[in-house]
């Protein structure tokens, strides 16, 4: 469900329509990259303490929060919320980085890992394709706000599903 990012084809446009300049957009992307760079090791230590499943749930909580913040930032045209969204999304990425693969390896072992990783990757690709194709229809019906709302709803579903991950 994380592949369902309905605003992805127009990520720059989402922010510029809310008053963010292209220059600031790229600074926000740099902030996101910086948070990921700085957060990889600390979140890895946290994952070692709390386990893969809980880290993946935290990642979903944070990603849902980031998408909700993006919607709020767009509606309110708030640069501060765009900044917070970039930080929260960066932390979410840190919690997912490598954790999904490690979770699958721990769950299925060497024999089942490759097939399950390919299966998970295929779902991500399918989600990306579905959201890219659906983008035009959603945009025509409900505009940019509709794209963001649909993404938040998809992330809410992913968040709910994360609680059903096996231990």
Predicted regions and their residues:
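C-terminal ends and interior cores of transmembrane alpha-helices
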Residues: 61-77
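Paired small-residue
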Residues: 80-88
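Cytoplasmic membrane-interface "Motif A"-like loop-to-helix N-cap segments
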Residues: 49-60
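Symmetry-related core transmembrane helices of the 12-TM Major Facilitator Superfamily/SLC fold
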Residues: 146-164
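Cytoplasmic helix-loop-helix junction between adjacent transmembrane helices
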Residues: 87-124
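Transmembrane alpha-helix termini and helix-breaking/packing motifs in multi-pass membrane transporters
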Residues: 128-151
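Helix-loop boundary and gating motifs at the non-cytosolic
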Residues: 1-38
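Residue-level signature of mid-helix packing/kink "hotspots" within the transmembrane helices
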Residues: 33-41, 128-133
């Amino acid at each position: 469900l994380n592949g369902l990012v309905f605003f992805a084809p127009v990520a720059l446009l989402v922010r510029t329509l809310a008053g963010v300049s292209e220059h600031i957009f790229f600074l926000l992307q740099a902030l996101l990259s910086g948070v990921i760079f700085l957060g990889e090791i600390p979140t890895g230590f946290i994952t070692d303490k709390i386990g893969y499943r809980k880290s993946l749930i935290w990642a979903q909580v944070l990603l849902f929060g980031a998408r909700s913040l993006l919607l709020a930032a767009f509606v309110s045209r708030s640069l501060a919320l765009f900044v917070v969204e970039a930080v929260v999304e960066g932390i979410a990425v840190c919690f997912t980085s490598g954790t999904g693969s490690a979770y699958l390896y721990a769950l299925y072992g060497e024999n089942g890992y490759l097939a399950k990783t390919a299966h998970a990757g295929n779902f991500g690709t399918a989600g990306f394709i579905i959201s890219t194709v659906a983008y035009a229809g959603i945009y025509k019906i409900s505009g940019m706000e509709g794209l963001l709302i649909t993404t938040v709803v998809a992330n809410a579903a992913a968040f709910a599903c994360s609680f059903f991950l096996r231990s």
